[in-house]
């Protein structure tokens, strides 16, 4: 079945190497006059000139293989006789006539027209008839049919050429698609009749630089010297020994554990090793025991190990009181202390000497250049001598590093610290046998200093600053700290037998400083005045649960009229946010 082609004349194609061109017309016949192309269908490029007569292919010498084969069949005759060729227009130049002639010649080569018909057509007289639209349509139709016949004839020629090729070439090689009608323009895959296969060669270019001979360092012993491999290193040989390791033991014979009757003499070296060193702790004259290490004498090359512990350094940290220092001075002076205590006359003389010393001009203990401004009699405060007071020692300024109070003026910060409240709590943790005890430090809020603390009906808002771990050191037998109160031209003193050491609550071992466990803050703490004040420690007071209360506590505090100290009574109120068990904690400072 013939494929449809668009109605335009075929372009001139160069002769292919595989296809056979038709033989040219005999030179004896005069060349026919080709009809001129229509003026309304110009080509985009000028047609090539007609080839000279000597450029046609000769079938005989160039294609000898076709001499022995059968000639291809002639093309079928046209269906209708061609119309009369009209005369060219008058305005057509000689060049246009030559172009038309060349196109007609190229078409004759492809279609192989009959020379007799061309000869007959050349003798026809030229007519001046103009081609109509109907005639032009019929002519186009005939040209299209002629092109189809030429294409069919060309396909037959190709098939006949393939059938005449040797079997070896047809079986091994498939027809390339480039030789079909749908030809792909590819310069690298042009069809050729060359049968041999070409091998692609890409030879390296000559070296641009001069060659160099380099020596390779080789270890001559690497093939002869024996080395242990990693597998041999990982191998663990099995050692089979006797079950008793060469030492026979009889568990039923207990006589082997008895000491020998005659002791064998030891060598001096072994006897020195078995000797125990007797560490003697000398007792000094002042009664302090000092442990001396055996490395202090004779072994200076050893490094002395220093142990940091509160037990070993406790005696060194304890300072002598005034009474002990006085006794030590008397011992050095050769005075018998027992004789002075039992001698009544000596006591009376010392008392009178103390009164005489008070009348003399006082001298400062450290700076002798200071002069006294006012001298007051110092007497015991008998009205409150039965009360107990405690001195609190902080490890640092309580609110100096606080976020809110640290930025205040030092005078305002001191005013807040003077009205601070300490409240003790006991927290029941995971270990019920050893509950955790701490003191809460609270100061009035920033705008609560103007309120009257003596008014019991007025509530004062306090801020919870931090918690402290506390430790009480009683010293009732020999108090070295006294509380002095100045009132009405006299100075009254009271002993402070209790010392309260406060340390900031820090993170436990294994926790960072940001993971300090904060305890719930009570919403209210009531402070009331009492006639007598004492220090009482309640182990089960202020037990907290895991719930958290308010962030600030409102309290009331009363100050004593005598100015000796401040006493507070803390009673938790029965509300939803209070978690104390109702016991009271009374403090005085």
UniProtKB/Swiss-Prot annotation:
Renumbered to this chain, the Basic and acidic residues biased-composition regions fall at: 88-116, 128-154
**GO biological process annotation, one example:** flower development
Which organs or tissues contain this protein? Expressed in roots, leaves and shoot apex.
Cell location: Nucleus
Amino acid composition bias (Low complexity), ranges on this chain: 55-65
Write the record's keywords in alphabetical order, separated by commas.
Coiled coil, Flowering, Nucleus, Transcription, Transcription regulation
Q: Which residues form a coiled coil?
A: 126-159
Matches recorded under Pfam families:
Paf1 (PF03985)
InterPro entries reported in the protein's UniProt record: RNA_pol_II-assoc_Paf1
Phenotype on deletion? Early flowering, reduced plant size and defects in floral morphology in whorls 1-3, but fully fertile flowers. Reduced seed dormancy and increased germination rate of freshly harvested seeds.
Q: Where is this region: Disordered?
A: 1-180, 542-589
Pro residues composition-biased segments: 1-54, 71-87
- The annotated regions of Basic residues compositional bias extend over 117-127
Assigned GO CC terms: Cdc73/Paf1 complex; nucleus
Tell me which family the UniProt entry assigns to this protein: Belongs to the PAF1 family.
Function per UniProt: Component of the PAF1 complex (PAF1C) which is involved in histone modifications such as methylation on histone H3 'Lys-4' (H3K4me3). Involved in regulation of flowering time. Required for the expression of the flowering repressors and MAD-box genes FLC, AGL27/FLM and AGL31/MAF2. Required for histone H3 trimethylation on 'Lys-4' H3K4me3 at the FLC and AGL27/FLM loci. Involved in the control of seed dormancy and germination.
Q: How does it assemble?
A: Component of the nuclear PAF1 complex (PAF1C), which consists of VIP2/ELF7/PAF1, VIP3/SKI8/WDR61, VIP4/LEO1, VIP5/RTF1, VIP6/ELF8/CTR9 and CDC73.
**This protein is called what?**
Protein PAF1 homolog
């Amino acid at each position: 079945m013939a494929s449809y082609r668009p109605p335009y004349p075929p372009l001139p194609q160069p002769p292919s190497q595989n296809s056979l061109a038709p033989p040219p017309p005999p030179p004896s016949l005069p060349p026919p006059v080709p009809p001129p192309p229509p003026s309304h269908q110009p080509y985009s490029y000028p047609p090539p000139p007609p080839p000279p007569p000597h450029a046609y292919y000769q079938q005989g010498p160039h294609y000898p293989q076709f001499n022995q084969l059968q000639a291809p069949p002639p093309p079928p005759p046209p269906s209708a006789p061609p119309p009369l060729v009209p005369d060219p227009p008058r305005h057509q130049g000689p060049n246009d006539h030559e172009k038309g002639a060349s196109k007609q010649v190229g078409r004759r080569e492809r279609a192989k027209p009959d020379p007799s018909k061309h000869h007959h057509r050349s003798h026809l007289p030229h007519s001046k008839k103009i081609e109509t639209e109907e005639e032009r349509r019929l002519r186009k139709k005939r040209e299209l049919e002629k092109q189809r016949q030429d294409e069919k004839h060309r396909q037959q020629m190709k098939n006949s050429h393939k059938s005449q090729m040797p079997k070896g070439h047809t079986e091994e090689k498939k027809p390339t698609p480039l030789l079909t009608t749908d030809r792909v323009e590819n310069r690298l895959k042009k069809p050729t009749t060359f049968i041999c296969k070409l091998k692609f060669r890409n030879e390296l270019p000559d070296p641009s630089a001069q060659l160099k001979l380099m020596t390779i360092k080789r270890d001559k012993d690497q093939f002869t010297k024996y080395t242990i491999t990693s597998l041999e290193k990982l191998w663990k040989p099995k050692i089979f020994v006797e079950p008793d390791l060469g030492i026979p033991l009889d568990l039923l014979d207990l006589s082997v554990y008895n000491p020998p009757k005659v002791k064998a003499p030891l060598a001096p070296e072994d006897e020195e090793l078995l000797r125990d060193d007797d560490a003697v702790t000398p007792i000094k004259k002042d009664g302090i025991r000092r442990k001396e290490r055996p490395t202090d004498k004779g072994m200076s090359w050893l490094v002395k190990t220093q142990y940091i512990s509160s037990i070993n350094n406790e005696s060194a940290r304890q300072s002598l009181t005034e009474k002990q220092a006085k006794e030590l001075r008397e011992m050095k002076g050769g005075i018998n202390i027992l004789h002075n205590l039992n001698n009544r006359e000596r006591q009376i003389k010392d008392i009178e000497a103390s009164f005489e010393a008070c009348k003399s001009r006082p001298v400062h203990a450290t700076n002798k250049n200071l002069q006294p401004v006012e001298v007051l009699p110092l007497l015991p405060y008998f009205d409150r001598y039965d009360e107990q007071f405690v001195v609190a020692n902080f490890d640092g300024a309580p609110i100096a590093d606080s976020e809110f109070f640290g930025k205040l003026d030092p005078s305002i910060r001191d005013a807040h610290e003077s009205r601070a409240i300490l409240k003790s709590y006991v927290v029941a943790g995971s270990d019920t046998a050893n509950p955790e005890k701490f003191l809460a430090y609270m100061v009035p809020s920033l705008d609560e200093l103007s309120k009257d603390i003596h008014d019991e009906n007025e509530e004062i808002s306090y801020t919870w600053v931090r918690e402290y771990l506390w430790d009480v050191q009683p010293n009732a037998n020999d108090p070295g700290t006294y509380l002095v109160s100045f009132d009405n031209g006299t100075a009254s003193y009271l002993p402070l037998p209790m010392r309260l050491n406060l340390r900031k609550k820090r993170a436990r071992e294994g926790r960072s400083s940001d993971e300090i466990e904060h305890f719930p803050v009570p919403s209210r703490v009531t402070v009331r005045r009492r006639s007598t004040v004492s220090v009482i420690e309640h182990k089960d007071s202020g037990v907290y649960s895991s719930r958290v209360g308010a962030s600030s506590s409102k309290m009331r505090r009363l100050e004593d009229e005598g100015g000796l100290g401040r006493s507070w009574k803390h009673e938790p109120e029965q509300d939803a946010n209070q978690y104390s068990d109702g016991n009271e904690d009374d403090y005085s400072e």
